[in-house]
Design a protein with these regions (language model features):
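Bacterial N-terminal signal peptides that target proteins for export
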Residues: 2-12
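Short secondary-structure boundary micro-motifs
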Residues: 2-4, 41, 216, 333
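Bacterial N-terminal signal peptides
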Residues: 10-22
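Generic "edge-of-domain/loop-turn" microfeature
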Residues: 17, 25-27, 65, 357
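Sterically constrained small-residue positions within well-ordered secondary structures
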Residues: 19, 48, 194, 340-341
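N-terminal non-catalytic accessory region
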Residues: 27-204, 208-268, 276, 283, ...
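Alpha/beta-hydrolase-fold enzymes
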Residues: 256-325
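C-terminal subdomain of alpha/beta-hydrolase-fold enzymes, centered on the catalytic histidine
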Residues: 303-440
Length: 440
């Protein structure tokens, strides 16, 4: 069994267990004529507040675990693809579109980056002409079905979906400084607070989701957090990024099942797409944390090794000028390690460990569109998706004054099983029932 098969088998084993347990332009918002946001909100919320409310939960999903609905109308960027139609993008999509091939979806979800460096970075990104992307069912649990076991568990303890369990979805191509994420999510949290008897809201994030929650917590006032936030449960947060994302700029990655492409055309379309996504760089290991502790890319011709500290050199040697520019801005984008960026709310973090985890690959060269030989993977301890360096990076939060910081290591529990793990869920429930810290 190669590494790709092993990872996918683990994904599916986790997902099957989850299914059984569960029972079944510019990107920045601009009111000027002709501009639009990349994702538009669709959805509404249920009515009257509960009596004797429970601590409400807002879930921040993992990378590509939020449903995106893509509408294509008279596109010309990919003449070999349908000119019009719709498809959805989300991990484990159970009804994938057959009109738009994976290559077509990659090309249509590739962002256009304005070369004008005088513009603020978030305003330089737009969709391909003729392509619009919406967050499907924003705020609702059906927008992130992977977490159904979490919803079912909370329901068994008195919670009601879409009333005191809500989902702060986002376009996983983008970083939290874009597309009105902050304003949209603040509004969702405040609405949840008021509709549940003015009860502070608990944030639960998984994988990349905690990065978006952390961005929110460090871009709101302490007074706002004191009023609206009960606490924060990050589950396997991808804090300083992960090493395995660096090969993706050359090999691509199919997010419908998190497997690497098996043909050169798909590898090229996917790798090129990820080079244009700001979140790719936010998800790539930050040299400030990783330094030279792991090899992320090793080439055969010429024989050369790259660590996270060499990331700019990697892109320079590959001739990827856009990647060089975006990496300089977005690698290490969400700050967390210094006291100025501590969340200053109660934190109950979870991680997995004890599983050999790929952190890099050996590639033939630095050409874009390579089909991966998984026997070349470099591994270290982790949760199958993220290495120990990533998962342990928030240990610095134990120095956060007054607020609680608890960090639980779930040995042998993989990244994708953590949100449905019985012990994790029981701790979450116990923490939801605890009073929040009152700090000066």
């Amino acid at each position: 069994m190669n590494i790709q098969q092993w990872i996918f088998k683990t994904f599916m084993a986790s997902f099957l267990a989850i299914s059984i347990l569960g029972g079944g332009s510019a990107m920045a918002q601009d009111s000027a004529a002709g501009s639009c946001t990349l994702s538009n909100i669709a959805g509404s919320y249920p009515g009257p507040a509960l009596t004797d409310p429970l601590t409400p939960v807002v879930v921040f999903p993992a990378f590509h675990f939020t449903k995106l609905k893509v509408k294509v109308q008279n596109q010309t960027v990919a003449p070999e693809c349908p000119t019009s139609g719709t498809f959805e993008d989300w991990f484990l999509n159970d009804s994938p579109n057959t009109e738009f091939s994976q290559v077509c979806q990659d090309k249509l979800l590739t962002l256009v980056v304005d070369p004008d460096a005088s513009k603020p970075m978030p305003e330089r990104f737009s969709n391909q002409p003729g392509v619009t992307v919406k967050l499907k069912d924003f705020g609702k649990t059906q927008s992130a079905p992977f977490y159904d076991p979490l919803y079912v568990f909370l329901e068994a303890n008195g919670y009601v979906r879409n009333r005191n369990i809500r989902v702060a979805g986002y376009d996983s191509r983008l970083t939290p400084d874009m597309d009105g994420f902050l304003e949209r999510t603040i509004a969702l949290i405040e609405e949840t607070y008021y509709e549940n008897g003015n009860t502070p809201v608990h944030l639960v994030g998984h994988s990349n989701g905690p990065l978006y929650a952390q961005f929110l917590l460090t871009h709101t006032t302490q007074a706002w957090k004191n009023q609206f936030i009960h606490g924060f449960t990050p589950i396997a947060g991808n804090w300083p990024g992960q090493g395995i994302f660096y090969p993706v700029y050359f090999t691509g990655l199919n997010t419908i099942d998190f497997t690497f492409p098996t043909n050169a055309a798909n590898a090229a379309s996917s790798a090129t797409m990820f080079q244009t996504h700001p979140s790719s760089y936010m998800s790539s290991s930050d040299p400030a944390v990783f330094r030279k502790q792991e090899v992320v890319v090793q080439t055969v011709q010429p024989s050369k090794t790259y660590t996270p500290k060499d990331n700019r050199k990697l892109f320079q040697d590959a001739g990827l000028s856009l990647a060089q520019e975006l990496a300089a801005f977005y690698v290490g984008f969400v700050k967390f390690a210094k006291p100025a960026f501590f969340p200053n709310v109660d934190v109950y973090a979870e991680k997995g460990s004890g599983i050999a985890t790929p952190v890099g690959l050996a590639l033939q060269d630095l050409s874009v569109g390579q089909v991966v030989d998984f026997s070349t993977a470099f591994k270290r301890d982790g949760d199958i998706n993220q290495e120990d360096i990533t998962n342990d990076a928030i240990q610095v939060w134990e120095n956060m004054p007054c607020f609680r910081f608890e960090f639980t290591n779930n040995v042998g529990v993989d990244h994708f099983a953590l949100p449905s793990n019985t012990a994790v869920l029981q701790r979450l429930l116990a923490n939801l029932r605890r009073p929040k810290s009152v700090c000066p």
